[in-house]
Amino acid sequence: MGYSTISNDNDIKVCVIMVGLPARGKSFISQKIIRYLSWLSIKAKCFNVGNYRRDVSGNVPMDAEFFNFENTDNFKLRELAAQNAIKDIVNFFTKEDGSVAVFDATNSTRKRRKWLKDICEKNNIQPMFLESWSNDHELIINNAKDIGSTSPDYENSEPHVAEADFLERIRQYERFYEPLDPQKDKDMTFIKLVNIIEEVVINKIRTYLESRIVFYVMNIRPKPKYIWLSRHGESIYNVEKKIGGDSSLSERGFQYAKKLEQLVKESAGEINLTVWTSTLKRTQQTANYLPYKKLQWKALDELDAGVCDGMTYEEIEKEYPEDFKARDNDKYEYRYRGGESYRDVVIRLEPVIMELERQENVLIITHQAVLRCIYAYFMNVPQEESPWMSIPLHTLIKLEPRAYGTKVTKIKANIPAVSTYKEKGTSQVGELSQSSTKLHQLLNDSPLEDKF
């Protein structure tokens, strides 16, 4: 019997319509919502009106003057972009069986919002408005700098020029902006975030799926931060090619543990952070030399291999051949006898993800399957690909969430370690080919480099 999702059970279709001036974190929040829901197996997609605007505008300059509401020609182009986006959203629900769409734009006037609400309701889609309102000058400037360096509108501009132009764009929108109001908009379903979480206004949230979205956005913090991911150092079980267990580190694993602080400081300097580990010995030993506050999470323990715990893949293939084949055929859904599947791990990781979104700088030291699930969340990796990603030992992965994606930096410790990666169709471990997924390639490209 197959799994069902929240959206399958209730046939809910929700369109989250973003509201807010530029540089308030709307695109960041939009992308986070999509990644979160997709990670939970809910079919969701973001429709960024800026992309549609660039498509319909041709060679028209995207400077601040383009957003002058009194420029009728450019206003018509922006309206056309919005029309194309909402048309695609309707098709996403009616032809692709989507569950949640995010309409990512300023939607700064009540007239625009009513137009969107009417279209959604006409097509049996539940509109849910989400406003990010802020007068936090520091946050706005930081967001403007981030957008100036990452937005496609400014790909050929110097950072200081892009920032100045973007601030002028904000001023154009401020002239006509109408924020959501609990009285004037009392008949609408909406959530309003004031200065991120200083105040949260919730109005007419009716469904379970809407409440899940509300709970999630109340936990995210669109502020600059770093997240480091690392497997424990090489363990004795790794050397013996066994899975699971609670073995100690090998000699090389202890070498990695002693070098980990240096790797973190080289990537970010002197910085305050918290270290999260699982309850298993090998992660705690890896964190032992770090001078930071430490927190253990049972939810970060390795995927439970059930009856196969402590066995090699060769032994599993010999003793449980049908299970071995079934896991290769559907690694995300397959559950070890008496153990867990990758889907089970995702479910138990949800509280970890929520708390991770609330925190600032965190170093997570955990296990291969768990890191695959966490990395898949931040990088929006499809379910069928995530269990096949290679997360090598003795490698620190630095994630930097940004407005238009997550910046990834891979830092190798240059301390040898065995490979525990098993490709599909074999019981042997080790990097046998380059035929795996794009994320396999991403995490195995050599020299240190930054990627989006």
Swiss-Prot record:
Xref: InterPro entries: 6Pfruct_kin, 6Phosfructo_kin, His_Pase_superF_clade-1, His_PPase_superfam, P-loop_NTPase, PG/BPGM_mutase_AS
SUPFAM superfamilies assigned to the protein according to its UniProt record, in alphabetical order: P-loop containing nucleoside triphosphate hydrolases (SSF52540), Phosphoglycerate mutase-like (SSF53254)
EC class: hydrolase
Enzyme Commission number(s) of this protein: 3.1.3.46
Primary role: Monofunctional, high-specificity fructose-2,6-bisphosphatase, which releases phosphate from the 2-position of fructose 2,6-bisphosphate. Has no detectable 6-phosphofructo-2-kinase activity.
Note: Present with 1680 molecules/cell in log phase SD medium.
Membership in a protein family: In the C-terminal section; belongs to the phosphoglycerate mutase family.
Protein name (record): Fructose-2,6-bisphosphatase
Native source species: Saccharomyces cerevisiae (strain ATCC 204508 / S288c)
